[in-house]
């Protein structure tokens, strides 16, 4: 898999769980990843597994093992470390208004609106995103609500969901 540090887990720890996941899928103990995305809720985008928890014994359900669309997984979740926090917070506000990650990728007006929200957030100014779809999550209780955004959390053992 070629993993890097994440949530206080080493590349070796991450690779080990990934290999077990691949084996579980191959023998039918774990279903292939299927939507909707567990971050943005998009039911139409292709999805993949993402782990937040690599501790032993392995857990194979949410919130340890999640199903995410490619946009959420690669462009939002993992890139939250290399961008100002306002990028992540603007994306989460978009999700909470019923937005999908694919909306930002496909719709220039939505992309501009989220960017305006981000800039307003950075300036400490009010800006309200227009609702897109009903949001079924409980704000503040989602698995992604309190993720660390600091680069140090990648290697900090305290970032682990469990020891």
Stretch-by-stretch model annotation:
Residues 1-9, 83, 87-163:
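Extended charged
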Residues 65-89:
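Short Cys/His-centered divalent metal-binding micro-motifs
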Residues 30-42, 84, 95-99:
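Short, 15-30-residue, compositionally biased linear elements
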Residues 28-29, 79, 124:
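Short loop/turn hinge sites at secondary-structure boundaries
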Residues 1-36:
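Short, charged surface segments at domain edges that flank catalytic/cofactor-binding sites
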